Amino acid sequence: YRKSVDAFNKKYDGKYFADIEFIPRNDSGGGYSDKINASVMSGDLPDVLTVDGPNIAAYAENGIIQPLAKLTDEEKSVYLDSIIQQGTYNNKLYALGAMESSVGLYYNKDILAEAGVEVPDADHPWTWSEFTEVLKKVQPVVEKKKGYALDMTFPTGEATIYYYAPFFWSNGGDFVSKDGLKVNGVFNSKENLETVNYFKSFLDNGYMSKVQITDLFESGRAAFKFDGAWEVNTIYNNYPDVNLGVAPYVVSDNWDGGRYTPTGSWAFAASSKTK
């Protein structure tokens, strides 16, 4: 972004000047969110700010950001439909994400080859039962490395729901009612309990560690890891010895054939004070 800002300032020298400030954000949203909230209260918001996807509607409803009314259809056409949908509130576009995100089931090709495991294609993902059998096959291979079949963590903040939402959805579960107003009977549904118990089976069978082990997959001591799309770049740049593959997410034995993945991204928006 610094390069883009420098190019902008060079192009519009003497007419406009842009500056950029990077503010760290922790897993619970603190730091950056605290700074923005304080700026809202003081009326000192910057002209352009980044907004996390789930917060766009609230920012728009409260008049913190303004519609991007001057964008043409041609300009909007270069963005994914999911990005346009994320940034739209009450039929008005308020924010645009520079990227999209999703999750993947990452695997170590060398470990799976040694265990004699073949990876299915996107149209025929492993079911829960099938994946359990796969974990059973790879466990002896990773035990020789003092590792686990699965590098699966449940971090605080938003990451846990983001990573594992497809498990719940493929089993017919959800987190809130369709109108967004109810949790009881939805979050604690029979389907969601089945999903949580499936996670528990990984611990019960010793396929994952009971405590988080840093870089377990990246160090070649785990066969699988569920993570975001950003993990690919991290592994390629920092762990080049990992023979990385990406498999479709595991689906429930009761899978209805639907495709489920979380999406969403930080987006750019213009504050309401911007002219």
What is the predicted role of each segment?
Residues 104-107, 168, 268-270:
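Short glycine- and hydrophobic/aromatic-rich loop-to-beta-strand nucleating segment
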Residues 1-58, 71-78, 91, 120, ...:
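Conserved N-terminal structural module of periplasmic/extracytoplasmic solute-binding proteins
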Residues 30-44, 62, 112, 132-137, ...:
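Short helices/loops that flank or line small-molecule/ion binding pockets
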Residues 132-137, 173, 178-210, 249:
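Glycine-centered hinge/linker elements that transmit conformational signals in sensory
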Residues 10, 14, 115, 193, ...:
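Extracytoplasmic/periplasmic substrate-recognition and gating elements
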Residues 110-123:
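Aromatic-glycine-rich donor-binding/catalytic loop that engages nucleotide-sugar donors
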Residues 51-104, 113, 129-134, 143-146, ...:
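Hinge/lid segment of periplasmic solute-binding proteins
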Residues 47-50, 223-227, 245:
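Paired acidic/hydrophobic, glycine-rich loop segments that form the ligand-binding mouth/hinge
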